[in-house]
Amino acid sequence: MDAKFHPAIAAIKADDLQRLHDLVRADPTLATSRSSRSHPTLLQCLVLDAKSSANKLAMARLLVDAGAELNGPLSACASCDNVEVAELLLDSGAAVNGAGGWSPLEEALYWNSRRMARLLLERGATIHNLRIAAGLGRVDLIEGFFNKDGSLKPEAGTINWPWGDLSVIENSNFGPEGRRQLAARFSSWRNDRQSILNNAFVYACMHGHIDAAQVLLNHGAQIDVIPGGFDYAGTGLHYAALNGHQPMIEFLIEHGASVNIRDEKVGNTAAGWADHAGHDQIRDFLKAAESANS
């Protein structure tokens, strides 16, 4: 963050509530200003960098009472499963569905923040597109996004992700290379029926919802496609492996998923993703499948 925030950041990281209080009292704009680098606000920094701090709720309350913006930090809570601060933000008026576009619930599903997803649903978050319904395994709602002829209704939504569109990316706090990579990936997407279906299919796989995945396959989802909407761009098998869903992995392989496809970010197979996440048994299972298919 910008230099003006550095003493407050140090106080947050030291879990020093009194020091943060003194700094904000001396300069209330610390709570309301936006940084041009790294975390956009001090409250968002607290959400992400002080998740295990004993005084995190008191520090968050201090910033909220000083006028901090709430919706961005709520999405940050969704990205890291920070339920405790999220409850405070929601109680303080944060919009459970966000300020439009990408919602906190979508953020929670993208990052596999399961407690946050439950909290947001309990607080009234809406399941307003195909991606969310697939990620939650809501087969009853998935069918409602299709017309009788199999086409998608407008309510199915378009592909989206945490980093917004090109204008948001270009004005973000990422460095030049980070902005370039995100912009290139965003520009490669298509928002036709097939692409939206494939995106939703990966959400079903990443959360282990076999019934939802089957419904989407029945509607034409492509099992081995790497869809738009992801920075670490992989197949449904990659994401099932990352999140440790053995039954989903077996389902996908039984339905013809390739274990040899490499993701577009770091060039790993699903076995590599399982290894990265510490799922040793799944890694070994997938490695054996790779050997059998070589």
Residue spans for each PLM region:
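N-terminal segments that cap or nucleate solenoid repeat domains
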Residues: M1-L42, L136-P154, A200, A212
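Ankyrin-repeat boundary/"N-cap" motif
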Residues: D2-A8, T32-A50, E69-S79, G98-E107, ...
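Leucine-rich solenoid repeat scaffolds
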Residues: E106-L121, N260-S294
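Extended amphipathic secondary-structure runs
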Residues: Q194-Q222, I226-G229, H245
